């Protein structure tokens, strides 16, 4: 039995891991799917002050209060920043990290560096528009279809802007985790392809692929679960 902590990306919530969590639980694992502050069922906590450090603390606190000591920490998309920041504090309590189409930060980087021009424009205009959270993308653009796309579109909520503009401090916590798996989907993104090239062949890193869209936990929960179980 392995403890898995599954961290969602921007606009989503812990709910998006439902299919994968059900499969991992059925296989005998213990699964935590926290929702980051200001999103999902915690969207009522959204303020202009919710930033990257808020979300990092969300995950550090799950590890601490659930008393996890040998966990697999999984981050999707934006959560690459959250997982990397959390690893600075709790790397010793992790047996492995999996990044699913996730952004891998460098020293002093921010999500605004990795996002689309449209979102950068919205962030730049925020002081005038007064918005504190970013609208998301349609689920169909993330590889979801049919009733799954309807479900994702219904439950996604605006994402706190400050989490995109806060710059991260990383000093090698993630690299100290013994096993690291980068899972790349078929979603077109040059910066994610660059990350694959960067980690391929590096000590402790493995790379795997899934032939599905960006929201792999919805689009291909069976395939994603199989890959995550290799870390158990």
Q: What does each of the following model-derived ranges do?
A:
Residues 32, 38-71, 88-89, 114-116:
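Active-site loop/oxyanion-hole signature of alpha/beta-hydrolase fold enzymes
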Residues 175-180, 202-205:
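Short, proline-enriched alpha-helix->beta-strand connector loops that line the catalytic pocket
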Residues 154-173, 186-188:
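Active-site nucleophile elbow and catalytic-triad environment of alpha/beta-hydrolase enzymes
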Residues 185-218, 230-231:
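Conserved loop-alpha-helix segment in the C-terminal half of the alpha/beta-hydrolase fold
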